Amino acid sequence: MNTEATHDQNEALTTGARLRNAREQLGLSQQAVAERLCLKVSTVRDIEEDKAPADLASTFLRGYIRSYARLVHIPEEELQPGLEKQAPLRAAKVAPMQSFSLGKRRKKRDGWLMTFTWLVLFVVIGLSGAWWWQDHKAQQEEITTMADQSSAELNNNQSQSVPLDTSTTTDQAMATTPTSPVDTTATNTQTPAVTAPAPAVDPQQNAVVPPSQANVDTAATPAPAATTTPDGAAPLPTDQAGVTTPAVDPNALVMNFTADCWLEVTDATGKKLFSGMQRKDGNLNLTGQAPYKLKIGAPAAVQIQYQGKPVDLSRFIRTNQVARLTLNAEQSPAQ
C-alpha cells in the first residue's frame, strides 16, 4: 500500500521537482550540481523549475536532464514521460536544396561579372600607361628640338665669326705695312747724290699681298727704331688707359653647372641672352632687363643665383621635367 502511494506521488511530481527532491536528499546544492555537470547555475535552476530556456535546443536540454538524473540516482525510465512534455523533440528545419541549374546560372553570372571587372581594370591600366608614354615622349622630343636649335645657333655663330677674324687680321696688316715706305724715304734722303736708273719693276712686287702673308711679313720684320717717329708726335694711347671697371648689375643672373645642360634665357625685351648647351663645371653670367624667362632641359644640373640669392628648382627636379620659370624683379620664380 505504501509503495503504490509513493509511486503515485512520484508520478504527480514533475521532472524538475523530482530532481530537486533527490538533490536535497543527497545534500547537494545547485552550485555543486552545476560544477559537476559543467553547467551554469541558472541552467540548473531552470531545469528544476521545469523551464525550457529559449536559447537552448531541446536536444541539449534532454541531455542535461539525463545527466542530472544519473547524478542524483534517478532511473531515466521514470523521467521519460516528463521529458516528452518538458523538452519535446522538434523537427529540424531543413532548407530546401537549390537546383543545380540555378547554382550554375549564378556561377555563370558571377564569371561574367568578374571578367568585365578585369577588362575594365586592364583598360584603365592601359590608358594610364599610354598617357604616361605620350607625356614622356613629348618631353623627350621637346628636349631634342631644343638641342637641335642650340646646335644650329652655335653653328651660325661660328660661321659669322670667321669674317670678323679675317677683317681684324687685315686691319692689323694695313696698320703695320706703312712703316716700310717711311724707312725707304729716310734712306733716299740720306744719299741724294746717287743717281741711278730705276730698276725694272717686277710684276710680282706690285701684286697685292694677301692679308695673311702681310701679317706674317710684318711680324717677321723688326720694329723700326725710335728715330722714325717724329719729334713732335705724341705716343699713341693704349687701350688700358680707357678701361673702366663696370658697375655690378643688381639684376645679374649667375648659373653654375654640375653636368651638361641645355639652356635658354630671354629678358623682358624678348632678347635671347643665351640659347645653347652648357658643359659640366661651366659658369654663366647674364645681364639684361628683368624679368627673365628661363627654359632648362635638366634642372638638376644647374644652380641659379638671382640678386645674390639661390633660386629653388626642387619642384622641377622631383617631377624630372623641363623647367620653365620666370624670374621677376622681386625674385619670385613662377612657372
From Swiss-Prot:
Q: Where is the composition biased (Polar residues)?
A: 148-164
Q: Which residues lie on this side of the membrane: Periplasmic?
A: 133-335
Which superkingdom? Bacteria
Limits of the HTH cro/C1-type domain: 19-71
Q: Which keywords fit this entry according to its UniProt record?
A: Cell inner membrane, Cell membrane, Cell shape, DNA-binding, Membrane, Signal-anchor, Transmembrane, Transmembrane helix
Which residue ranges does the Swiss-Prot or TrEMBL entry mark as DNA-binding?
30-49
* Cytoplasmic side stretches: 1-111
Query: Where found in the cell?
Result: Cell inner membrane
> What SUPFAM superfamilies does this protein map onto?
lambda repressor-like DNA-binding domains
Q: What Gene Ontology terms describe where this protein resides (cellular component)?
A: plasma membrane
Q: Compositional bias (Low complexity) at which positions?
A: 165-205, 217-239
For molecular function, the Gene Ontology terms on record are: DNA binding
The annotated topology with respect to the bilayer is:
Single-pass type II membrane protein
Task: State the Gene3D superfamilies in the record.
Answer: lambda repressor-like DNA-binding domains
Q: Where is this region: Disordered?
A: 148-239
**What pairs make up the disulfide bonds?**
none
Transmembrane segments annotated in the record for this chain: 112-132
Asked if the keyword Transmembrane helix belongs to this entry, the reply reads yes
Q: What is its main location?
A: membrane
Fill in the domain comment: The helix-turn-helix (HTH) motif in the cytoplasmic domain of the N-terminus is involved in the formation of spirals to maintain the rigid rod shape. As this protein is anchored in the cytoplasmic membrane, the HTH motif may contribute to protein-protein interactions to form the RodZ helix, which is localized beneath the cytoplasmic membrane. The C-terminal domain may be critical for determination of the rod shape by probably interacting with enzymes required for synthesis of the peptidoglycan layer, including PBPs in the periplasm.
What this chain does, per the record? Cytoskeletal protein that is involved in cell-shape control through regulation of the length of the long axis.
Family named by the database record: Belongs to the RodZ family.
Q: What is the name attached to this protein's record?
A: Cytoskeleton protein RodZ
Query: Which source organism does the UniProt entry give?
Result: Escherichia coli O6:K15:H31 (strain 536 / UPEC)
